[in-house]
Amino acid sequence: WGNPYCDPFHDILVHPRIVPYLNTILGQGFRMDHTPGLITMEEDGEGHTFHGSAGPGFDPNCYYIYKNGEIHCGLTVVAWQFSDTNPGDGGLCVIPGSHKGNFACPAAMKKYEQYQEFVKQITCKAGDAVIFTEALTHGTLPWKAKHQRRSLLYRYTAGNLAYVSGYETWATSFADLT
């Protein structure tokens, strides 16, 4: 999208409320990694399989370390919510504490077939931002609300890391961000 339609997306890219958190967990000089993801779901939209955490296919760029009283993360997501998510609506869900695990998540849990009591749906209001590490096992529950789910995902990493290999071709609307 060209100007002025892209301006709100630019404004929240390094929103002053999230920058201190990203500086703390990623370090000064963090950078955007991946192109943004704009998610919309209508009522009865299907969910998305859980991913992240340890186990087969583990990516060392998706790490979580706590050492000497400080948290350090690799690839980190800021999920801006543009619509309310109430209990039972579906949407973003996580397995709390899984970012600290050293063992693979059971396949039945990743498919939401078993152990559902360990899954937490994230509730929030429009305008909220949810920050989490890609090391956390997360996914999407089917959308049950009458209103549309709207969420924007920005992914960041430490300035010296690159999760996406090589360079992506960015949309022209991002040209003025450099």
Please describe what each predicted stretch is:
Residues 1-67:
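Non-heme Fe(II)-dependent double-stranded beta-helix
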Residues 5, 33-34, 46, 74, ...:
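Residues that flank catalytic or metal-binding motifs in active/ligand-binding sites
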Residues 35-37, 78-80, 152-156:
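A structural signal for short, well-ordered beta-strand segments
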Residues 40-42, 95-101, 149, 155-161:
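Short edge-strand/loop segments of extracellular domains
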Residues 48-55, 95, 137-140, 154:
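Histidine-centered catalytic micro-motifs
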Residues 51-63, 107-118, 148, 167-173:
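Short, surface-exposed loop/helix-turn segments at secondary-structure junctions
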Residues 71-141, 161:
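Double-stranded beta-helix
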Residues 109, 129, 136-178:
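Non-heme Fe(II)/2-oxoglutarate
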